[in-house]
Amino acid sequence: MPCLEALARLPLPRTLGLRVPEGFAYYALYPEAYLDAAAGFAREYRPGRCIVVGLRSIGTALSAVVAAELEAAGAAIESLTLRPRGAPFARRPVLEPGLADRLRHRRDAWFLIVDEGPGLSGSSFTGTAELLIGLGVPEARIALFPSWLPDGRAFVSERAREIWPRLRKFHVPFEALRHGRELMRGARDLSGGLWRALVCPDGARWPAAQPQHERRKYLHEPGPATPNPVLLKFAGLGRYGVAKRDFAELLAAGGFAPPVLGLEHGFMKTAFVPGRPLGRRDLGGALVATAARYVAFRRMNSPVAEKLRLDELLGLVENNVRWGLGADWLDRLGRLDVTPLFRDVPAVAVDARMLPHEWIRTESGFLKTDGVDHFDDHFFPGPQDVAWDVAGFAVEFGLDSRAADEFAGAVGAALRDPSLPARLPFLTLAYVATRLGYASLAASSLGATPDGRRQAKLTKRYAWQFRRAVLAWEAGV
C-alpha cells in the first residue's frame, strides 16, 4: 500500500471538517440509482475504456459507484475528481497542466461526468463538459450522470442552456429503484407540495411551498396491510436518518409530534394523525402555552449544542437590510452591538418552521409537524439560539409586541434563561431577514407558477414585517 504509507507520513491536521453529502442526507439520492444508470450505459455502449470524473464533494462517492459497476462490466477505468470553481452560476474546473495534457485528445475513452444535481445554473456539469471539449474530447464521447433530468431551459447559465441538451445523460429515478417501488406501492405521493391537496382541499388557501426543496414523502392510507394511515418521509441515509428518527421519537414521547413507527431505506414512518392545519385565526392561550412548552422541551432535549455563530447572523441582517429594504435603511439599523447578549448562549436544534400550517389541531390538542429537519439542512439558520423559534412563532402568528414579550418570558422562565426576552428583538430582525431572503429567491426561481405567486405575496409580507422590525430596533422597542 505505497499510497497509504506515503499519506501516513504527511503532517496531517488533528481534525478535518467534512461536508454533509446533501443528496444522501436530504434529497433521497441513492447510490443504487448510479449503479443502475452505469449498468444501462454499459449495456447500450459496451465501452472499452472510461475516464470517470466525479465532481466534488458528493460526486466523489457517486463516481466510485459508477466506476465499480463499469469495471465489473469489463471496462478499463481511470478515475479522477474535480472541483468546479468560480461564480455560483458559472462554475468550471481548473486543471493543472500535467492533468490537462493527460486528458487531451483522448479519443479512445468515454468521459463520464458524475455528480448530484444539476442545480439552478447547470454550470458544474456543463462547465466540466465544456472544459473537456476544449481539450479535444469529442462531444459524442461525453456522458453525464445527474440525479435528475431537467430539460435545461430554466438554467440560469446561458451556456448551460445551450450545452445541456446536446450531451448524453444517464439517470435512473427513485421510482425505478427496487426499494423505491416497494415504498411507493399503494402509496399516495405527497412530495413537492402535493400534501396540501390532502390537508387543505381549497387550493386558494394553500400555503406557499418551494417544491424543489421539499423532501420526498408518501402516504399509505388504511388497508389490509396498514389499518391506520402511515406517513413516509425521507429522513436521510445511514446515520443521518437514525439521528432524525431518534429525535422524532423524543418529540413524540413528549407529546408534541406524531408517533414514530420506524425507519426503512432512509424513510421515517410516522402515524398520520387526523387533524386540521392551523391559521393565524387559531391563535389563543392554549396554543401559546403548548408552543412555549414545545420550544422549551426542544432546548432541554436538543441533540446538538454548538457555539453560536453570531457573526453570520449579524452579516445576514445587514446584507438583507441593504438588499431587501435599501442601503438608506442601514442608518436606521445602526451599530448591531449585541455580542454581550449572546455570550455563552448555545446553538441548539431549533424547529425553524413555526408557521401556522405546520401545526395541527387534533382531537386531543395540538401537534407540531415537520420538526426534525430544518436545524439540519443546508438552509439558514441551522442550529441556533432557542429564541429563534420564539421569534418565528411571534412573527408567523402575528403576535403584537406585548404578546411576543410574554411568550418569550414564558419560554425563558421554563428554561431559567432570564436574558431570552432581551435577545428577542435582534432575533426577530434575523428571522424576518432570513424569511424575506428565502421567499424572494423562491419567487424568482418559481416565476409565474402558482407557488411563485404565493412566494411573491409572502415576500411583500416579510418586507413589511422587516421594515417594522428595523423601525422597532431603531426605537429601542
Feature annotation, model-predicted:
Residues 112-113, 348-350, 367:
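Residue-level marker for buried hydrophobic side chains located in beta-strands
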Residues 171-174, 361-363, 367-370, 461-474:
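Short, structured interface segments
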Residues 391, 405-476:
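Helix-rich C-terminal or lid/interface subdomains of diverse kinases
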Residues 346-356:
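Catalytic-loop of the protein kinase fold
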Residues 201-334, 356-358, 363-365, 369-433:
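Conserved ATP-binding subdomain of kinase catalytic cores across diverse folds
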Residues 1-211, 276, 282-283, 303-306:
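PRPP-associated nucleotide enzymes
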Residues 45-50, 107-109, 228, 315, ...:
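A short, charged/proline- and glycine-enriched loop
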Residues 181-200, 327-328, 456-476:
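Non-catalytic membrane-proximal stalk/linker segments that position and tether the catalytic domains
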